[in-house]
Amino acid sequence: MRSLALCLLLMLAGCDLFERRPVQTLHEDVRFTVGSPYQAGGVVRYPREAYGVDETGLATIAPDYHGLTADGEIFDQTLLAAGHRTLQLPAIVQVTNLENGRQITLRLNDRGPSSPARLIALTKRSAELLDIHHDGTRVRLQMIDAETRQLAASLQASGPTLAVAAAPQGKVEAETLAPPGGAPQSSRVRQAAATPAPANGTAPVVEALPRRLPERIVQFPAAPGRLYIAAGSFSRADYASILVNRLAFLGARLTTSYTASRDSAFQIRIGPFDTVAEAEAMLTRAIQAGVNDAAIVVE
């Protein structure tokens, strides 16, 4: 009986050690993926490959998860990574905490968050570097097109090429820069253009990106902005006016953006709102009114 109890204790101890062992390598099935439409939080999402992405919204911190991310990596809270509802995976982006001006570079490698009121789900390490300690922090996401294209090309051409060895983390680097040019745009997406083939017909040489991106913090002035509901964008004012009239009971109004792409020049906004709770409540009403792609933005 004593021997059986000892064996059980050893088995439990072994399981505990296994669960706490840090992940040091990637699963072999890391892949470029866009994915099919799916439903989350009562809203259907349509993943797409896009570049020139510049979005604002609210961040959350991803819960612990023992499994694979949407692009085939082993989920790891210590990586500079995050989940996004619709963008291609993996993708390299800059994320700025608009409430304190901190900016880091991370890799989108998973789907999420499930709530339609959140733009991005950060790993715990990403949240630490951005000094984010609560759900609903205002952030800006900007895709780094060159590195995202490089990563996509490497994975599509020859399969998994992320460097599987964990790079030394070293110390966190930080610097202070002047504010970025232009006010943050709530959503500015440009569809991918075809990449011209090399003149000699050979495949381009692409270098694998490390699994652990450098922990480098860039400090900008804080620019928390105000919360709005983005309820649609159109290339023509008359098209936008139809939806504005339909959402008049919510206080929708038509605005013109001179920095967004031509097909998003006429934008519908509801707000502003003083609190996240107020914005979330209005977002729910907008979705119930049939605007499935409505989102909370910061302007």
Predicted regions mapped to residue ranges:
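Sec-dependent bacterial lipoprotein signal peptides
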Residues: 1-15
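Secreted/periplasmic proteins
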Residues: 15-222, 233-235, 239, 298
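A short beta-strand micro-motif
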Residues: 95, 229-231, 268
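Extracytoplasmic
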Residues: 204-224, 233-299
